[in-house]
Swiss-Prot record:
Family stated for the protein in its record: Belongs to the GroES chaperonin family.
Cellular compartment(s): Cytoplasm
GO cellular component assignments: cytoplasm
Subunit organization: Heptamer of 7 subunits arranged in a ring. Interacts with the chaperonin GroEL.
Record key words, sorted: Chaperone, Cytoplasm
SMART domains: Cpn10 (SM00883)
Function per UniProt: Together with the chaperonin GroEL, plays an essential role in assisting protein folding. The GroEL-GroES system forms a nano-cage that allows encapsulation of the non-native substrate proteins and provides a physical environment optimized to promote and accelerate protein folding. GroES binds to the apical surface of the GroEL ring, thereby capping the opening of the GroEL channel.
Gene Ontology biological-process annotations: chaperone cofactor-dependent protein refolding
Protein name (database record): Co-chaperonin GroES
Superkingdom classification of source: Bacteria
CDD domains (UniProt xref): cpn10
NCBIfam families found in the cross-reference section: PRK00364.1-2 (NF001527), PRK00364.2-2 (NF001531), PRK00364.2-4 (NF001533)
InterPro entries xrefs: Chaperonin_GroES, Chaperonin_GroES_sf, Chaprnonin_Cpn10_CS, GroES-like_sf
Length: 95
């Protein structure tokens, strides 16, 4: 991946929801909400505190995370849709 977020920003790839029901019906995109779950694909170096020291991020590449529904900015890198957001927009890490 050719992107490196700055400071306390994180790049997340959304986890796609199922497009069909258990009975085989296809669900159109207009009938589903965007998922608020994803996988971290890149992280910044961290946020600087008042002393100028860098505070490392709590999330790492590969973490499965939950984030606010309208968090982040959608970007396209290498033909893939990704979200770039501040670490504070992530509400939980799924283990």
């Amino acid at each position: 991946m050719n992107i490196r977020p700055l400071h306390d920003r994180v790049v997340v790839r959304r986890v796609e929801e199922k497009k069909t029901t258990s009975s085989g019906l296809i669900i159109p995109d207009s009938a589903t909400e965007k998922p608020s779950e994803g996988v971290v694909v890149a992280v910044g170096n961290g946020k600087k505190n008042d002393n100028g020291d860098t505070i490392a991020l709590d999330v790492t590449i590969g973490n499965k995370v939950l984030f606010a529904q309208y968090a982040g900015t959608e970007i396209k890198v290498d033909g893939k849709k990704l979200l770039i957001m501040k670490e504070g927009d992530i509400v939980a890490v799924i283990k």
